């Protein structure tokens, strides 16, 4: 079997009991063998400041290296005020700068938005996609992943307990794996 593609999973929530972090862990356990998922933490990143471009903070350099080393990126995000959380936008900015040296460039991406509400983070999902287009990240278009009603989605072990949602996520992950194979750069 070929070496699994490395997928950086970026969770857009810092909350300790985050539904999005639970989702990231659940999909890690569900991922097909062709993908190796790793959650890349964003909570330690300083706010992006262009004045630091010549000598970026160590945390920013380490984060950017992890993104650069990945074959693809999977964003798992909540919705705050019909958009992405500030911490996620900051992480995107940190790894995209200085201009022309983006770690995101050309990396296939997927977006899963997770919410306890009925619309499953629709606003955040679409707003994030706009930024990813600018960053030259080919984003999986179908299936779109809006996971609503997430408050009672996970069992005590952290697995997805709703059969319909599990089936959908299996379909999404299979499509994402195929997308990564079609659009990622050839392994070195």
Outline where the language-model segments fall:
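Glycine-rich phosphate/pyrophosphate-binding loop and the adjoining helix
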Residues: 2-4, 8, 49, 138-188
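A general structural signal for well-ordered alpha-helical segments in protein cores
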Residues: 7, 20, 24, 60, ...
């Amino acid at each position: 079997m070929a070496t699994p593609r490395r997928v950086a999973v970026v969770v857009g929530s810092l909350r300790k009991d985050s539904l999005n972090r639970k989702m990231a862990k659940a999909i890690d356990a569900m991922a097909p063998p062709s993908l190796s998922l790793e959650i890349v933490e964003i909570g330690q990143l300083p706010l992006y400041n262009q004045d630091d471009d010549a000598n970026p903070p160590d945390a920013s350099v380490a984060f950017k290296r992890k993104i650069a080393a990945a074959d693809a990126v999977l964003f798992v995000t909540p919705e705050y005020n019909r958009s992405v959380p500030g911490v996620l936008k900051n992480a995107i900015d940190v790894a995209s700068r200085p201009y022309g040296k983006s770690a995101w460039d050309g990396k296939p991406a997927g977006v899963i938005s997770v919410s306890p509400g009925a619309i499953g983070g629709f606003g955040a999902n679409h707003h994030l996609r706009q930024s990813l287009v600018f960053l030259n990240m080919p984003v999986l278009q179908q299936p779109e992943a809006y996971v609503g009603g997430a408050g009672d989605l996970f069992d005590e072990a952290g697995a997805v307990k709703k059969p319909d949602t599990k089936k959908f996520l299996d379909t999404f992950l299979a499509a994402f794996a195929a997308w990564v194979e079609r659009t990622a750069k050839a392994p070195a």
